[in-house]
Amino acid sequence: KTKSDKNELLFISNIKLTNEQIDGIRSLDFEKDGSSSINVEFSKTFNKVALPINTQVNFSAMSFDAPIYDPKDSPKFVLLSSLLRNEYLHKRVREQGGAYGGGATYDPFSGTFKMFSYRDPRFIETLEDFNNSLTWASLGSFDDDMILESKLSVLSDIDKPSSPAGEAFKDYRLNSENRSQKNRQTYRNNIFNVTKEDIVEAAEYLKNKPR
């Protein structure tokens, strides 16, 4: 990882290193001349692409521009994704549509909200289900029990144990993005505080975004 004018090396091992191995890592020279900053310009584009292949099933996906990580706003979108996945898309895309899998996810790091299906015998109808799911949520067509189930699902995913190496990498990544332990706890607490109105607001936000 390049940070400011210094290069950082993150080294994670599942085995105990010998002193010789540790000394070897410490002896590596990562210094370099000049500035490490690179100016790159990006422009957002939204493409609608279909790639026909000789198969009876499809992979379909739809993505939306969503807010970058914020302890206050992000919980609304992560709960919306869980609600759509478990209460709407599972029934429409998998049970009724016949897809092997599908769902919705929100990535706060990239600011992207995604819906997808795979091994899906349908195509256009599935895309319509994606759009209709946001209409369903924006109309508040869900109850408090569904919201509670979504909160428990999200918190279970946050709290699930990982390997020591996985925990080390996760902690490094979050700290490098200025997400302190206090910041993360605030995010977790805010998941409890999300209301039905918050989820409706998040759905309305995505409905008005290009895809």
Per-region residue spans from a language model:
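Substrate/cofactor-recognition hotspot
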Residues: S82
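M16 family metallopeptidases and their MPP-like homologs
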Residues: K1-N14, F59-L79, L89-K196, P210-R211
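An aromatic/glycine/proline-enriched structural segment found at the starts
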Residues: E8-S60, A66-I68
